[in-house]
Amino acid sequence: MRLLVPAWACLPSLLGQARVLRVRRIEATDSARRRRLTRETGPATDQSLLHKLLKDAGSDKSFHHGYTRFYVSLFEPLREKPVRLVEIGVEQGRSMKAWQLYLPNASHIYGIGYGNFQAAGSRPRDCFADAHTRAAVGAGVPCTLYQGDQSSREFLDAFVAATGGAFDVVIDDGSHVPSHQRLTFERLFPAVAPGGLYAIEDIETSYWTRMNRPMYGYSLKNETSIVEHMKRVADAINREFRYGGGGGQSPLPAVYDSVSTIMFAHNLIVLRKQLPGESRYSDRKYRFYRDGHCPHHQTSC
């Protein structure tokens, strides 16, 4: 027996399909609008070689975080030099390929991935064991992957000892836990070469909260936040003025005394190490050493 369904009975279904189609059209339009907006407003650094290499490697440093906005001007002077670069948190080593291509004269590139440094099979290994990838990036740029825990002081010290330090660039893209970021900086920054750069990515975790509670036990006004802690580096750099006549005193451990500059950017902090002779400006005795005034027996300072 054939059932005849009146046309009006199909109306809700037809309307529902129309709504779905309309939503899909809106989503497609919004997606196209977002793509167009990205093309129109993307910074000029999106056209840089570094951005392209990181994007092609699948690294979110380019297309999501946009760190290349800052890295291009910082790293471009290093391109042809025999630099030593370390990246912490390399996952499967995707960005390692980009660094090798971007720094063709690099002395050595090191990656640190999470793992047990002491376990069997966790010994340092070549970044690209397969012949195809090795041929693509070139055999002239040594690249070694280590496995270890950046919350372990012992591992960080062992890594510096094994590699010899003297790093020109260190990039912390590891656990993003603020206490790990601070420990890693304090163990590796002494191994950075004079004039070298140290970048801490994903400082967003110092702002995270869940149900009005800091997710990592920190808060922005808590000094254990990496953002709040690094704000104090400005005081360490300017310790000549902060401490009146007590040149050489600093509000932070001595490792911070060798910081020349610090840059705060979107989701990123970059520090540069002093060159030889720079410390004399921060460590000298301030000429206006008593509350900003000259000593009584002097008419000028």
Write out the residue ranges for each language-model feature:
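A short alpha-helical cap/connector motif
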Residues: R2-V169, S175-I200, E204-C301
